[in-house]
């Protein structure tokens, strides 16, 4: 481990925002009793929360603890929620919008073209497509909006 690579306050902040934030939002929607029958609760997440992806695509690089841990926790929260609300007639989807050209990914600007990074408007269209296409049969699935395939845990 490199010296001074961990900032525990920052790691906790990321977990609070990226893992608990979507859970808070979904909880508020459910508690409001304003959701229609068949409502879809969508969590925008990242393949960075996939342990399998992390051990293959970025093998031997480590780092970004807060980001990866917060996304894995976010995905687990959504999976648990999907089981809990299935009986209420709601589905829960976890969607990775793909590699988007944003301020958050700017540090990877040198590989945007190589890795196929897209404008966020393209990522948003991909997300909408998956939301429209998927429903109760896919509840609890972790889906890559780039190709529609399920992302392994």
Where would I find each of the regions flagged by the language model?
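C-terminal helical subdomain
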Residues: 94, 102, 106, 110-153
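Conserved Rossmann-fold SDR core element
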Residues: 75-81, 85-100, 137-142
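Catalytic loop of short-chain dehydrogenase/reductase
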Residues: 1-17, 23-24, 30-86
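Soluble or luminal CAZymes and related metallo-dependent hydrolases
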Residues: 21, 73, 119-123
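Short connector loops/turns at beta-strand edges and beta->alpha or beta->beta junctions
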Residues: 47-49, 98-102
